[in-house]
Regions:
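Surface-exposed, low-hydrophobicity beta-strand/loop segments enriched in small/polar/acidic residues
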Residues: 1-175
Length: 175
């Protein structure tokens, strides 16, 4: 008998299944959980970690962090050499995108004190700066004009209510 786990997420993926994949990240710290909607990546040892503004490759955590079974979702070990890995179990499932549309509620975005950094249509999506409070690490952030060295993971295409939609690429563009 196989056991099945299901997840809901605040992250909305607006794409055909054939246009994206999920990247499995084995989370080293099995005592804390990661909110969905945060950018995650691999560390140099192959484990998952919160991404920062210097990472060129980043995935969006899809697994719901408020589910009663979140420890099962994020803390179960998985075998990265296995040819079959269920989406529902073992580590984090990061959305791996190449020009797909994602939507993340505004409450999950990093918003600096300046209104110039508020998400708006046409702004670039980056990762909260390292100087941001630790509680904001890995959150998506918006910038109007890419400065030299900035890594952009997409552009905001629309805002509906409190939900921010953007075209997402897991391989960032560095300016």
């Amino acid at each position: 008998m196989t056991q099945e786990r299901k997840s809901e997420s605040i992250v909305t993926i607006n794409a055909k299944f054939s246009s994206f994949n999920f990247e499995k990240l084995n989370w080293r710290d099995r005592t804390t959980t990661v909110e969905e909607g945060r950018f995650v990546t691999h560390d140099t040892s192959g484990y998952g970690r919160l991404a920062d503004e210097t990472d060129l490759i980043a995935y969006v955590n899809f697994l719901v962090s408020s589910a009663p079974s979140v420890q099962d979702f994020q803390s179960d070990p998985f075998d990265p050499t296995s040819p079959v890995q269920a989406l529902e179990g073992g580590g984090l499932s990061g959305v791996q995108g190449g020009g797909i549309e994602l939507a993340i509620p505004l409450a999950r975005w990093y918003v600096a004190a300046s209104p110039a950094n508020d998400p708006a249509v046409g702004k670039h999506v980056t990762i909260a700066p390292g100087a941001a409070p630790a509680a904001d690490h890995g959150k998506p952030a918006a910038v109007a004009a890419p400065a030299a060295g900035l890594i952009s993971f997409g552009v905001i295409t629309k805002i509906r209510g409190d939900t921010i939609f953007f075209m997402y690429n897991s391989i960032g563009t560095q300016y």
